[in-house]
Amino acid sequence: MNAPLDQLADWLAGAEAVVVGAGAGLSAAAGYEYGGERFRRLFPDFAAARGFTDMYSAGFFPFPTPEEKWAYWSRMILCNRYDPIPRPAVFADLLALLRDRDYFVLTTNVDHCFQRAGFDKTRLFYTQGDYGLWQ
């Protein structure tokens, strides 16, 4: 048996409500890596032209024209908000743990994965916005 997981299961079973705090690690576990092979596959032109190595730091680049800036950001949002979740089971498994409970999720994630996995949007607070709103 796994003592920490058993303890967590006991806590969940006895809880009146559950508050989940979720950050970038959960999205990374679901396959949203902002660098590495995924970045090279999705942004080869920006990597070659600008020397970018990941999506996060590229977002701070002072693009010389609005066209180039929005070419980058529209693709970044498409890949991280609208394309299928690479490993959707991460969010589906969490929802299965919470489904019949009084829960609330506080997240810094902007990728809309909670909503796309079926979480009730009235039980979510995404403090850093939502790519779907171009925030």
Predicted segments with their positions:
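Conserved catalytic core of sirtuin-type NAD+-dependent deacylases
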Residues: M1-Q135
